[in-house]
């Protein structure tokens, strides 16, 4: 048996015991920890085959596990591949063909990969979004103000190829070990391209002299650091539902040089906070389906049930209901999701304008599927005076 067949058999074994209950990356880590004889090349090849299986999304569900792995590998690969040459040489001979033609050869339809086109937000191209699952997204960093030259110089010195998408946004190879090259969070933050573009809405608030800011679903603090960099000297309050989440945030803030901020630990789906009419800006990067990021974790698409959307919508509405009273008259709510579903995006904006008399200033689909980046939604709303 060739090493390529061994890789395929290992991938089949891993996938047959995986049920989607934990992130697949963590599952792989456990498998490799239990099989220490596998070297770096073995781990890379097996991981690639497993992810090829998931990148087909909902397409080819009738195929056996090994057939689906190879079909995914064929669709996700554009250059001559040694494994395909050994196992499916007839496919390897046409490896550079158009991806839609490849799918047709396999009897698959591009729209089967992500079959929820009717649920998409307006303006998202269903076919292009489906095709984006067949490529691994890039790694992006946002250079923090004043560090542009030093970060680029360090990357060049380390021999890292990068693409400059804007003066502060760089796209890099996924395997780049940034922590060995730059001061992460101090000089630059790892932040997806679309997530960085939320800063354009924050920039519109610079003339408003925003002072008191509440990042109500702060997670690891990426939007808070962005707000600090864009808006300058703000009084920052961060909240999340668990102490462990804020522990990671505090570590990141320390690395970023952010020392002055307030913390709250509360479940905003159950209750609000006591500070009514306090904040000039509330950033609500709410829990969501994460569907705009699934090209990074394609197992989530494979296991996704459309009925789960409503669960997220109800959670989002509960959080929004409990935070609006903390917004000052004349203040702003920045609503953000990494979802592509209309119910989590535009429909929640309508919920806010209808039930809380908020005014919509701007909403935008941050398309990343044509840039090997995440796709997100952001809306800036304001609370009228009086």
PLM region descriptions:
Residues 1-386:
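S-adenosylmethionine
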